[in-house]
Amino acid sequence: YDWTKSAGQQYFMQQAKKYGVDHFLLFSNSAPVQFTKNGKACANKGVSGSNLADNHYADFAKFLTTTTKHFTDKGYNITLIDPVNEPQYDWTEGQEGSPWTNECIAKLARELDKSITDQGLSAQILLPEACQWKALYQDGTEKRANNQIEAFFNTSNSSTYIGDLKNLKRAIAGHSYWTFGTNADLKDIRQNVWNKAQEYNLDVYQTEWSMLDKEPSTSAGFPSSYDAASYMDISLYMGKLIHCDLTYGNMASWSYWTSFAQEKWGQKNRFYLLRMNTQGDNNNESYGDIQNGGTITDNSNLWVLGNYSRFIRPGYKRIDHITNKEENLN
């Protein structure tokens, strides 16, 4: 191992710890290329199962736990290991990632569980980072890795059941993409995933969202198009989505993707909390090389998220409240 690699990521870990962050999650989009079927960190078209070679599941698990132990020994409190991401997708031709069937995820989880125990770690496994909520509770939503709560936690599914693993977090992780276009989706889909999670006593974690989809409907209170929407319209809708994730989905964790980025192609602030601009930019959009320096500017999205994270602290509990007033998400 060369522990000087990923210096930028390590810098942010150091700064986060300095500012008081006391829980860290380590995630992987792909196994190291020496363990993959095609020697790449993305998959070939038509790959079966996953891009992780069949004889390297234990090796990948050991890589994850060795890395976790290294940072634990350096004083970081690594609470979660997140080994797969959006397993429903193909992840071909250049974008880092791997498809995973439920069977392959279960196989990796079992190896990772053993390796965590062997290394004497306290970190737990978080799964499965579903690309959208429906893949967690129903069949036929995506081309693979569907109905994942049942697959992993129903004992009758012998090939994929992992609910008895000692080091598996009693939570289910997914993403709020593709399910925020209408008020009905914001409510019903989130209630569905919560209801299914409750059958197996699982927390629900929302671990990745930005405004990746066509614009929400005007009936949901959004302008007629992204072109017509202001930066504040986008931020306020993000606040509405967080509210629905917390209240209808009872989600115990919420994360945004990504912290900072360059604004491009008329997308405004759909994909960042902080905007990066390179030297010489004349407006908000930026297409230059950030390695040449520039500026970082906060955005209203940061304050939307901050007004949740500042006032809803770890360990807080929601109190049930029933009202006879008609619900109005707008």
Which residues make up each language-model segment?
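Conserved beta-strand positions
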Residues: 26, 83-86, 127-128, 174, ...
